[in-house]
């Protein structure tokens, strides 16, 4: 089953071409590592997928056969969840920060939520002893796990990861990648289909460790899309 189809996507800003005729397909359950030099258009591509960037000049992006422009934007972003380089922590405890995602719509019954919450904590490698800790006091790696836990609790079937390890040291980055490795191929809580990941990284070794396929972008062009 195709999860995403990007067809002849073109993006320009202030007359400058950012992405040129980007075309590729992503199967449900795949983990795609996106690599390339700074300024190549990697983040622009991810932001196009869940409509965070309005600069598209041509082409289309289909999620499960339907153009992303035809979805309600809130529904789209609940399903195609964006995880930024540094997860935003709000005032409150770690638990309160994770459960914020429950305010933005889900399809779970009240009696299902606690069981799902416990599963998410385990999947995101969040220990019970930090749940009462102010989220802003957590380490960088712990905060990134909280960011992942939020989207897992929403049941988002597609995770768009924009350099989630960029601000982490090597040891913390390796631990975070192990967490992602465990999530890879797992069922999305919302619909039972497998989770699909697109992750930008500047570290080729991370892409090879995690990904099924690597998409290389240079100067707004796809120069390689290959199995790992």
State where each predicted segment sits.
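ABC-type ATPase nucleotide-binding domains, specifically the catalytic core motifs of the NBD
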Residues: 96-112, 123-125
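Conserved ABC transporter NBD signature motif
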Residues: 58-67, 76
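Hydrophobic anchor residue at the start of the ABC signature
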Residues: 148
């Amino acid at each position: 089953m195709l999860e995403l189809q990007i067809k002849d996507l073109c993006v320009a800003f202030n007359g400058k071409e950012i992405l040129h005729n980007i075309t590729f397909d992503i199967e449900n359950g795949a983990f795609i590592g996106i690599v390339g030099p700074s300024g190549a258009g990697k983040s622009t591509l991810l932001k196009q997928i869940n409509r965070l960037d309005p600069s598209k000049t041509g082409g289309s992006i289909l999620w499960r056969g339907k153009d992303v422009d035809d979805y309600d934007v809130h529904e789209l972003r609940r399903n195609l969840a964006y995880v930024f380089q540094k997860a935003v922590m709000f005032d409150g405890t770690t638990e309160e920060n994770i459960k914020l995602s429950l305010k933005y719509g889900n399809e779970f019954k009240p009696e299902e939520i606690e069981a799902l919450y416990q599963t998410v904590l385990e999947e995101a490698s969040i220990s019970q002893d930090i749940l009462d800790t102010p989220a802003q006091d957590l380490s960088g790696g712990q905060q990134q796990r909280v960011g992942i836990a939020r989207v897992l609790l929403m049941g988002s079937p597609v995770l768009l990861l924009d350099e989630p390890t960029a601000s982490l040291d090597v040891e913390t980055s390796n631990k975070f990648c192990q967490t992602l490795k465990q999530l890879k191929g797992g069922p999305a809580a919302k619909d039972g289909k497998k989770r699909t990941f697109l992750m930008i990284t500047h570290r080729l070794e991370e892409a090879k460790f995690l990904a099924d396929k690597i998409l290389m972008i240079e100067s707004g062009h796809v120069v390689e899309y290959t199995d790992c």
